[in-house]
Amino acid sequence: MDQELFNRFVKCAVDTLKVDAAQVVPAARFKEDLDADSLDVVELVMALEEEFGLSENIPEEELAEVTTVGQAFDIVVSKL
Amino acid sequence: MQGLGHRVAITGYGVVAPCGIGKEAYWNGLLGPGITGTRSVEIPEWDPLPYFESAKDARRSDRVEQFALAAAQEAFQQAGTLNVEPSRFGTIFATGIGGLHTLEEQVIIRVEKGERRVSPFLVPMMMANASGAAISMRYGLQGPNETICTACAAGTHAIGYAARQIAWGRCDAVATGGSECAATLTSLAGFSNMTALSSTGSSKPFDATRDGFVMGEGAAVFILERYDLAVARGAKILGEILGAGSNADAHHITAPAPGGTGAIACMNLALEDAGLSASDISLVNAHGTSTPLNDAAEAEAMTHVFGARGVAVTSGKGVTGHALGAAGALEAAQVLLSMEKKLIPPTAGTTQVDPAMTIDLVTGFARAWTPAPAISNNFGFGGHNGSVIIGPGE
């Protein structure tokens, strides 16, 4: 895992989800561990798209499958 | 109040306003200096965090909803524990506009960054009913939950309609009031271009040199309760809603009906509802926006109903500015504070009452007062008129 990329991911998660950086680990589950519902995840993904300058948006079908930080991070990396 | 015979007690209230957060600070603010040199007054350094479980929850609420929840917290704390079924505890709330700051921010984001960047929280944050929804969810109020959006009359209409829910027997308690936070750059431009705002940036209700209103913001929330239930649980009765009136000018989208005919009819409806005559009213908390047209029509209406200089009149808008849909709520709170303090705050900013008016306007210094029924009036763009008559508590 690219630590520099992940640090940028953590910063987005801290800003949008208002959680501690230490909570944002690959195994963390959005709903159970980060108290983030589906709209929170949408907002996080929007922030990630902006932070990483993704030219294509992450489609809803892909988002629906995401339950953990690690999964979300992998999707972002795959779009870079 | 007409209905099934249930009297309506006020057992708690809370206030958030630029001149003070919390009832005591608000009262001190009302006795302080008026507004000069600004087109809007806003709550300085507002911090929503004390009123939310988490920073994320606070960020998901528009400032208008944050104000509402803050005022609700003070109101519920004062009211204490009510013996009311959730299904018979309603929420009748007011706003003129709703989450306008959120809408404006997101419009800018859409234009600058595209549709994909528009927040998924735009809709729940901008919708006018968000404040009432938030209050009902936080306190588990499962009775009717309706939001009234009759512009500057909304706060007064909400209090009147909330009281009616109890008088009619539908509810045993209702959280009511109003919140507003609408001084965005776009809305200020609109109010300014329609020449409603003071070009000199001063609010001076009924003054000979008044030239428009100053935009305000804030919220007030009241806990209304069936009087006998409040007495039975030993609650302190802070005041009583004795009657309310609501009607329409059906005349013009922004200008009041000439001679204040709609306002006259509205005050008379409230008096009839309360079973009182004009001579029973000892204080008018006026709409008194400081606009040339409103204040002229309102002064004429008051003279018609109460006689020339027949009743003490005050307007808080010299201090608070005009908080649109929250105005009626902020002003009902002024009436309750006057009842507690036995003082009528002066109409700040006003030094020379318009010589064309024959009203007994309290200016300069607070006036000693023996609490007795008071009427609070508010009138909204669209020709909406609202009056509510509040009596002292125990």
Show where each model-derived region lies.
Chain A
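Alpha-helical residues within the helix-turn-helix
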Residues: 15, 32, 50
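Glycine-rich loop motifs involved in handling phospho/adenylate chemistry
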Residues: 25-39, 59-68
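Thiotemplate assembly-line natural product biosynthesis machinery
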Residues: 1-22, 77-80
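Phosphopantetheinylated carrier protein domains
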Residues: 42-65
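Conserved N-terminal glycine/acidic-rich loop preference
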Residues: 68-76
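Helix N-cap/coil-helix junction residues
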Residues: 18-19, 35-36, 54
